Structures are given as C-alpha cells and as structure tokens.
Amino acid sequence: VLYNLFSRGIERDVLPTCTRYGIGVMTYGPLNGGWLTGKYRRDEPAPDDSRAVRLGAVQGNRWDPERAANRTKLDLLDRLRELATTAGLPMTHLAHAWAAEHPAVSSVIIGPRTPAQLDDAIASADVTLDHDLLDALDELVPPGTDIDTVDTTRPEPQLSRRVRRRPR
C-alpha cells in the first residue's frame, strides 16, 4: 500500500486495523514519485532525468508545479529540506526512514531506478529518526493526511463493469 510523508491516509484505517490484528504491512512509494528526494524546487525546471520529465507528457498535469497540490508539496519541501539539513540527513534518507517508522510497517519497497539510487536507499536502512524530528514532521503533515488525491487514486479493476456484471 502507498505510504509516504505526502500520502498518509492509511494511518486512519489500514495501519490501525493491521496493528490490532498483528498484520504486517508492506508499503511502497516512500519518495512519493520523486517529490521527497528534494530534486523538485519552486521556480526551477525539473531535472532531465526526473519522472516529471520522463512521464510528464503521459501523465498530463500531474507534475505541473502550478497545480494546487503540487504548490502545497513545494511549500512543504522547503520546510522538509530545513528539517533534513538540521538532522544531518539527505532528503531521501529522511523519507525512507520515516516510511519505515510506523510499527505496523514491516517492509518498505524502495523501487530504485539506478544503481546510485539503490546505494542511497541501502545507506538509509540504518537511519533512525528521533521523536522531536518525528513530531516536527507530524506538525508539517498531520497524521492521516493525503496531500494529493492523484497520488492515492488508482484504477480499481474490481469495480469495473466487466467484473461487476454477468456476461450477456
């Protein structure tokens, strides 16, 4: 299930339910499609190797910095960079460590695209965030908050007409 600092909706129902019944949760997307790497900045073009450039034409305005949700992300990223710098962490390490912090999360799928991204993700495996930093992150993005519903909305094949109706 998707879980990262910008997509925290599962904290409302999925994670508490899994905790109650002793079920471990495998999450993915700890970098929110690259947003939490720190590479996206206000008034700067997206890097050439970024998902925004590679998939921008296919995914429409999802990466448009003028979208309201993306403006919110850019505002939050300014503060997240400050918190990461104060903690002496790269943004990616902060994001990976945060995603693994919830007690119901048993595993975080990292999804690197390059060997350098893999090395960076491996280096973040031993990072532990202190309670003050976790509290600051909760203040910034309150528990249970989804910044952008586009991130958490996926086609649900089980709701398609083909699956819900008998063949005629």
Provide a role label for each language-model segment.
Residues 1, 25-27, 108-110:
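Hydrophobic faces of well-ordered beta-strands that scaffold small-molecule active sites
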Residues 32-33, 99, 114:
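Positions that flank functional sites
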Residues 18, 25-28, 80, 94-95, ...:
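Conserved, mostly hydrophobic/aromatic
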Residues 43-86, 101-106, 115, 119-168:
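Terminal-tail/helix-coil boundary detector
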Residues 92-95, 107-111:
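Conserved active-site loop/cleft motifs that coordinate metal ions or position small ligands
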Residues 2-9, 29-31, 97:
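Active-site PLP-lysine loop of aminotransferase-like
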Residues 10-55, 90:
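Aromatic-lined glycan-binding groove of carbohydrate-active enzymes
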